[in-house]
């Protein structure tokens, strides 16, 4: 089967199109990681909490922790280092759109920095999630990226960058602690603003602190720790500090050892202490300031070691005054005054506007412990606020701030077994952040659709404003307002204040988001229902240090302590100081106002498990977080309009490869408007119009499946281009290999002769002149090629048969044929078989049709060494009996055209095989039963076959047994070929394109490479001969095994050379006589007339011309594929007929006369003979000048070579057969 090649393209030279400056050339991303799940939750086919969880789980287990919801980043804490925050990874995100790279916190940072520069807008990122979900880590990575991405032109800019980064270890040490859920939990909230100058370089910064958890200083639950700085200081303090401040190990202090957890996994306190000291130096804290900070920390630790006992009156008394003396030394206050402030409380009585009496009320042990702890908490809280203000002072040292990027890292939503005032404050702030998240997200979405004039369907969502009002409202009063009223009513008694607050809570029972339960109340937050304890909640809301403690600190001689406690006691003031609830409401509203002035980005963090394990994924816990974070609503809001949107330029840059209007060979060629380019891309990609809308500046795609289809087509583009390049390269290499093989074969044949012809000659000797020869066996091109079914190739029918019958060895001979099958009481049948010969075994393969699929099975497996003899007749039939030496099987009787070649291969493999040739074939029809098959001459038998009936073979008389193989014909001479081409062009007028359209289309069977049908005498063998190389087809040197079909109408613009003209150049150029002088002009010759030798009913195709035996027609064109273009004598119909069915009409004696401009008469057309030989008529008068003839021939040869070069890709010549 010939290799099909595409026709060559007509290449038109064009100037390369200028690529738009806004569209980048597409490149194949070889480092692209195979995606697990979807990188954007809006692309989920099904939207549900379970589907979101399943997608996050797949990515988490694949070490992919980041996922988008539109522009919102979802981050799952991996609890391990994934190596995704290196400088190399950071560089991959610089200057990239978020769709060009996988989801990452660096992509959010790049987007903020880019938007600030491009749109001159303030940016902020809101990081939310529960404790231990990775909020602080995300904030650190954003600061890391912005510091690295922004340019540095001056030393001061570089210093600001270093200071911004130094705030992380400093504030982590003083504001983070180990909890049961997180080893580095932020116990405060902060909003860091990085300010940039007009060149977008960081030039300043500011930190706002929110609600430090002061209670952690004095008490922690079991297996938790105090703030990191206490353990860093007690473990890593220098000898000078230990001597000056009396620093001991953490086990020696109540505040650090009471919870039973001194160390924590993944935390190195000594190393972190050095990082803290380094950060202090970078920020600009002097050594004296550092000494005072650590002096206060030592004082807090020693305050915690102050303990009390009961005196004789049952009041509190300091157990060890040496401890209070050392605390007084550290705070630089009077020791007795300190003791008095810890065990007594000053009370004043008022009489209207007059000041009343002052009383010193002694405290019991519980009250004294509370006063001690209040002093420690006050010192640490004020120290933390001073550190934040000191950092801000350093960051504001450089003027010129224009725009800013804000990073909000705030505590996550908290639900504990016992929840008090701290939890209601934390959860209130998270409610406010959720509110602004929903408002800004939905508002931004609505504004986008309105701006782009896009139609969309609004989505319902839960607005938690009602919960925020429940907590913060003043009219009607909310929970904080009710708490303030209770404190004002019973300020002197905490228990009374709690009872008053419980009574006021009855006002909220009608609110659907509130529930009252005895001494507890429930608020139904967006993240879940939280139960709060009433006991002690009002006292925490006061947030006031006792006036006597304030007066105590006012007596200090330490200027640093006086600095961090700037407020003095105003005993005359009657105005109620602000409570903790007032402060948190003001801070939250200020935060919302600040965030509303910036363009927000969002990071929603998720904690996958409580075990802090990198391999555990708790579905139940994650599902709870998905619900209270509102991820499903966020996805629905995002997809309420469209799952994907992109500006025209970016969309074209991404997908222009999908449209031939916009691209060629990977280059962007579109010169028009980008909107038109978008339309062409969507149109050429067959995207339905209802799946997208075009806005003013952006394209909006409805469903994620549409985007998947576009991305898939874009990916396949690169695969298709690679396949085309590979195909062209393989074709080039194969042509080189074929050319080299042809040259090598020619050289070997010149030196040693053709091995296939040698094998043929050896086979002729094997028969020893004892058997009549068939005409096809004597052809000069006949050679013993062996594997006619191409079994040894990877993709062929022979290889398929070989695999079916499980043959592992190399096949040296393969052919289709027949085998005689006998049945008891019935006539023998000739069944189709396939014969495969390997170096050791002869296989006879049968075929059966099973469910419309051909199945091949082994009928015989014969060891070559077990073959005793082969038996043949002495006539030209093709029957062979394989006689086995010892076997329980009968001897197979087979029929194949290439019997001589099969016997030759068997003889070479087993020299002991006897070749028995006689008038009959003898073989064992059954084991032990000898059977004889006679052969007789019958001229009525088929010319190319035989008749088998009743153990008798009837066949025509063949060639004599001693007939020799014809000499292989010489190849065409290039000069004669050129002469022939020149003559052909001169003698016949080329058919115009318009005329070619009227030529009948070739029969449908010829389009499938099917040869013309054989004459009726050969049709009884057509089925078996169809897959056998026809020796008759080897008459022409340019033919291959598969007979080519005649050209279609579209390829017949130029007529082919006549067979007679081709015959003129068959190796006789040395004897060509000089042409005679030009004769006078003659009339135009008529077409040759042919007569139908057989009936040709045709296949029903309109391009065929049905004929009856004896019909006479004109033959206007003859093709080498076996078809001729015929026309009725009256010219009423024209069509294709098989050449083998036609013979020259006896009354046709017209010889065409030569044209005026040539001096060589045109030869007569070949007559097609039944024996497949040609009787060529050579003109007698060829007596012109040899020089003129050679000149014309060379000119024609040059013209032919030029034409062949132009059409080389379209019509490559078939490889020449060697046999």
From Swiss-Prot:
Residues covered by the IQ domain: 719-739, 740-765
Domain (Myosin motor) ranges: 36-715
Binding positions (ATP): 129-136
InterPro entries assigned: Fungal_myosin-I_SH3, Kinesin_motor_dom_sf, Myosin_head_motor_dom-like, Myosin_TH1, MYSc_Myo1, P-loop_NTPase, SH3-like_dom_sf, SH3_domain
Note: Present with 2280 molecules/cell in log phase SD medium.
Subunit structure: Interacts (via myosin motor domain) with SHE4; this interaction is important for proper localization and may regulate the interaction of the motor domain with actin. Interacts (via SH3 domain) with VRP1; this interaction is required for localization to sites of polarized growth and may regulate the interaction of the tail domain with actin. Interacts (via SH3 domain) with PAN1; this interaction is important for late stages of endocytopsis. Interacts (via SH3 domain) with BBC1 and LAS17. Interacts (via C-terminal acidic tail) with ARC19 and ARC40; ARC19 and ARC40 are Arp2/3 complex subunits.
Protein name per UniProt: Myosin-5
Taxonomic source organism: Saccharomyces cerevisiae (strain ATCC 204508 / S288c)
Lineage: Eukaryota, Fungi, Dikarya, Ascomycota, Saccharomycotina
Gene name for this UniProt entry: MYO5
């Amino acid at each position: 089967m010939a290799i099909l090649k595409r026709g060559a393209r007509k290449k038109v030279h064009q100037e390369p199109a200028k690529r738009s400056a806004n569209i980048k050339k597409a490149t194949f991303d070889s480092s692209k990681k195979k995606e697990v799940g979807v990188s954007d939750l809006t692309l989920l086919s099904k939207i549900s909490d379970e589907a979101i969880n399943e997608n996050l789980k797949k990515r988490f287990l694949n070490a992919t922790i980041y996922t988008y919801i539109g522009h919102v980043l979802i981050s799952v804490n991996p609890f391990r280092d994934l190596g995704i925050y290196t400088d190399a990874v950071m560089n991959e995100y610089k200057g990239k759109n978020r769709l060009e790279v996988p989801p990452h916190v660096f992509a959010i940072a790049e987007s903020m920095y880019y938007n600030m520069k491009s749109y001159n807008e303030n940016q902020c990122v809101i990081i939310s999630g529960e404790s231990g979900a990775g909020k602080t880590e995300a904030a650190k990575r954003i600061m890391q990226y912005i510091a690295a991405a922004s340019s540095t032109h001056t030393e001061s800019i570089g210093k600001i960058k270093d200071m911004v980064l130094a705030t992380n270890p400093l504030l982590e040490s003083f504001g983070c602690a180990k909890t049961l859920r997180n080893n580095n939990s932020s116990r405060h909230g902060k909003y860091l603003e990085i300010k940039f100058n007009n060149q977008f370089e960081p030039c300043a910064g500011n930190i706002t602190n929110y609600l430090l958890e002061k209670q952690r200083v004095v008490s922690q639950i079991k297996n938790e720790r105090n703030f990191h700085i206490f353990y860093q200081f007690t473990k890593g303090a220098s000898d000078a500090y230990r001597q000056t401040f009396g620093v001991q190990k953490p086990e020696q202090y109540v505040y650090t050892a009471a919870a039973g957890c001194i160390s924590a996994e993944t935390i190195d306190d000594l190393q972190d202490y050095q990082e803290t000291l380094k950060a202090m130096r970078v920020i600009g804290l002097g050594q004296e300031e550092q000494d005072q900070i650590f002096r206060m920390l030592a004082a807090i630790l020693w305050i915690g070691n102050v303990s009390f006992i009961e005196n004789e009156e049952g009041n509190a008394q300091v157990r060890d005054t040496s401890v209070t003396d050392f605390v007084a030394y550290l705070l630089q206050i009077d020791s007795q005054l300190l003791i008095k402030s810890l065990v007594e409380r000053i009370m004043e009585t008022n009489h209207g506007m007059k000041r009343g009496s002052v009383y010193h009320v002694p405290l019991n042990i519980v009250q004294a412990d509370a006063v001690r702890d209040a002093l420690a908490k006050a010192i640490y809280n004020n120290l933390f606020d001073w550190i934040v203000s000191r950092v801000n002072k350093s960051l504001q040292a450089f003027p010129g701030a224009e725009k800013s990027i804000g990073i909000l890292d705030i505590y996550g939503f908290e639900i504990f077994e016992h929840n008090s005032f701290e939890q209601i404050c934390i959860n209130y702030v998270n409610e406010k952040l959720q509110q602004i998240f929903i408002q800004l997200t939905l508002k931004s979405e609505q504004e986008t659709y309105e701006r782009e004039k896009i139609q969309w369907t609004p989505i319902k969502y839960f607005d938690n404003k009602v919960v925020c009002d429940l907590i913060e409202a003043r009219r009607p009063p909310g929970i904080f307002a009710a708490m303030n009223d209770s404190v004002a009513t019973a300020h002197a008694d905490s228990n009374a204040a709690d009872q008053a607050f419980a009574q006021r809570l009855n006002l909220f029972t009608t609110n659907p988001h509130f529930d009252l339960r005895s001494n507890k109340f429930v608020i139904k937050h967006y993240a879940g229902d939280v139960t709060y304890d009433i006991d002690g909640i009002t006292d925490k809301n006061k947030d006031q240090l006792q006036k006597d403690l304030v007066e105590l600190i006012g007596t200090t001689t330490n200027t640093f302590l006086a600095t961090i406690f700037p407020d003095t006691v105003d005993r005359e003031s009657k105005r109620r100081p602000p409570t903790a609830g007032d402060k948190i409401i003001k801070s939250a509203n200020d935060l919302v106002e600040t965030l509303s002035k910036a363009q927000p980005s969002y990071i929603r963090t998720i904690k996958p498990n409580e075990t802090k394990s990198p391999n555990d994924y708790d579905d139940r816990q994650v599902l709870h977080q998905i619900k209270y974070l509102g991820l499903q609503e966020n996805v629905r809001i995002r997809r309420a309009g469209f799952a994907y949107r992109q500006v025209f330029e970016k969309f074209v840059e991404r997908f222009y490869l999908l449209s031939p209007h916009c691209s060629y060979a990977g280059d962007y060629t579109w010169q028009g408007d980008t909107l038109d380019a978008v339309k062409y891309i969507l149109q050429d990609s067959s995207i339905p119009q209802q799946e997208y809308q075009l806005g003013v500046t952006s394209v909006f795609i409805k469903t994620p499946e549409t985007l998947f289809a576009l991305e898939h087509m874009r990916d396949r583009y690169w695969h298709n281009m690679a396949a085309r390049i590979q195909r062209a390269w393989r074709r080039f290499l194969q042509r080189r290999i074929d050319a080299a093989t042809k040259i090598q074969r020619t050289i070997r044949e010149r030196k040693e002769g053709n091995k296939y012809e040698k094998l043929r000659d050896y086979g002729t000797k094997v028969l020893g002149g004892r058997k009549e020869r068939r005409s096809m066996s004597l052809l000069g091109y006949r050679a013993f090629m062996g594997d006619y079914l191409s079994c040894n190739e990877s993709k062929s029918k022979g290889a398929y048969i070989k695999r079916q019958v499980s043959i592992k060895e190399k096949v040296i001979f393969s052919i289709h044929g027949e085998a005689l099958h006998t049945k008891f009481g019935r006539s023998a049948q000739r069944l189709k078989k396939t014969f495969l010969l390997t170096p050791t075994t002869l296989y006879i393969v049968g075929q059966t049709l099973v469910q419309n699929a051909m199945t091949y099975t082994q009928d015989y497996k014969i060891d070559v060494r077990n073959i005793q003899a082969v038996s043949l007749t002495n006539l030209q039939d093709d029957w062979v009996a394989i006689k086995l030496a010892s076997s329980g099987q009968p001897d197979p009787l087979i029929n194949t055209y290439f019997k001589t070649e099969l016997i030759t291969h068997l003889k070479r493999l087993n020299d002991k095989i006897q070749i028995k040739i006689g008038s009959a074939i003898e073989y064992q029809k059954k084991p032990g039963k000898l059977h004889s098959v006679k052969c007789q001459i019958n001229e009525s038998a088929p010319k190319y076959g035989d008749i088998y009936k009743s153990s008798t073979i009837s066949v025509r008389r063949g060639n004599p047994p001693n007939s020799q193989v014809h000499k292989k014909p010489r190849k065409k001479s290039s000069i004669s070929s050129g002469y022939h081409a020149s003559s052909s062009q001169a003698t016949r007028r080329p058919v115009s394109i318009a005329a070619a359209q009227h030529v009948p289309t070739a029969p449908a069977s010829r389009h499938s490479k099917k040869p013309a049908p054989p004459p009726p005498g050969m049709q009884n063998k057509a089925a078996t001969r169809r897959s056998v190389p026809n020796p008759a087809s080897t008459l022409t040197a340019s033919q291959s095994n598969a007979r080519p079909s005649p050209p279609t109408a579209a390829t017949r613009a130029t007529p082919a050379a006549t067979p007679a003209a081709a015959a003129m150049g068959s190796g006789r150029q040395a004897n060509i006589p000089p042409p005679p002088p030009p004769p006078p002009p003659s009339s135009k010759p008529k077409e040759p007339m042919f007569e139908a030798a057989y009936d040709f009913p045709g296949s029903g195709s309109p391009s065929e011309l049905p004929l009856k035996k004896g019909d006479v027609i004109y033959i206007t064109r003859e093709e080498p594929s076996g078809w001729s273009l015929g026309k009725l004598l009256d010219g009423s119909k024209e069509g294709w007929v098989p050449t083998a069915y036609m013979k020259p009409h006896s009354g046709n004696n017209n010889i065409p006369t030569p044209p005026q401009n040539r001096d060589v008469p045109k030869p007569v057309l070949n007559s097609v003979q039944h024996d497949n030989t040609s009787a060529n008529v050579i003109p007698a008068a060829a007596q012109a000048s040899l020089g003129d003839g050679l000149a014309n021939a060379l000119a024609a040869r040059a013209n032919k070579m030029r034409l062949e070069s132009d059409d080389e890709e379209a019509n490559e010549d078939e490889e020449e057969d060697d046999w």
